[in-house]
Every structure is written in C-alpha cells, then in structure tokens.
Amino acid sequence: MKRNTDLDLIRAILIILMILIHIVSFGNAYPHLKAGILSFMMPTFLIITGYLVNIEKTGRQMRNYLKCLALPYVIMVTGFSVLSYYMPVRDGITELSLSQIGEKIFITSIGPYWFIQTMIICGTLYYFSFRGRNWNDLHKNYTKRDTYASLFVFALTLLLISETPALSASAAAYYFIGVVIRQSKTEWSKLFRHEFFAIFLWIYLLYRDDWYDWGNLAI
C-alpha cells in the first residue's frame, strides 16, 4: 500500500490532540471539550490502525511486528503498575505481587497502555484469521468469498475475546471497521473526502455530549 499523506496528516492532528488532552490544566479548564475530543480521537486511531496493519507478511515478520509492540508494552505496564501501588492511580494494583502485575499485563492493562494491548490482540487475531491464504499466490487464488470467510472468522474471534476483560467490544469494533476498509481495497482518500462542511459536523459532534459514548457509531 502506498504512503497516504492524508493519513499522515490525520495521525499528526490526533497526536497533537492527545498531547493536549493530557495537559492537566487544559482538562480542568475545558472538561467538556476534552470529553468531546476523546469521543472521536481513540475510535479514529483504532480505525486507522486496523486499516494500516499489513498482514501480508511471513510468520517471522509478523512476530517481529508483535515483538516491537509487546516489549515496550510489558516494560511500561510493569513500571506503571508498580507506580500505581505507591500513588493514587485509577485501577491501580492493591498488592505488589507478580499475580497482580501479571493481570495488568495480560488481562486488564492499565492507564493509556490498553491501546497497545488492543493492537497486539487484534493484530494477532487478524493475522491468523487470514493466515490460510498463500501469500505467494495472493492475487491469483484468493477470492472475495475467501476474504468474506476470513473476515467472518476474525469478527467471531473478536466477539469471543471481547467477552473477557482483555478486549473492549467497542475498541474491537472500530479496529474491525478499519480492517474491512483495507480488505475491500478501498482507498482511504476516496472513502473519506475533503469537505469543508465537515468542520461544522465536528463542532456539532462536540456539542452533542449524548454521542460521546463509543458505542454510538455516529462518532
């Protein structure tokens, strides 16, 4: 897939917004605006992530990709978990033990690191759901029916895992949307066009706090 400058711009804007909402003074001064930004920022990140993940890789390449996610994830979650024992952190550990730290790493996660955990879980399921294809003959033999079957398997595994504390159903849904866009061979710039009036829809979204729930696909 060719580099998409539109996606680069969107990700840059989202990163700036992420930095902004984590400034304590901004959140205290504009709590409603912060909640509005959060309502679309992470769902957009998840859709883009699902769209950009490349599963046309060998097993070794995919392992390297997952390792690059898992290693910093384990380090950061471990450090944050230990810190949460000594400081008032939401959903922190109550006992400094391997079992509680292991629970944070492998099941519930902690702090902002849930996003990396979601990337690892969804990326792994995505890859293995489509792993039946022969990458060397990808464009010759893999039919639309095969793609639909793989998407069904992927959706089913996401649904099952989302019944556990390890994966949020809404996060899985947004990731899946990105995957569907990618597998449909639809170009991002053709699906999401530049329209000036979109800024008015964005302002309206910020005004409608009843749409802040991720479960509302109006996001």
Q: Where do the PLM segments sit?
A:
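Alpha-helical transmembrane segments and their immediate juxtamembrane cytosolic regions
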Residues: M1-I219
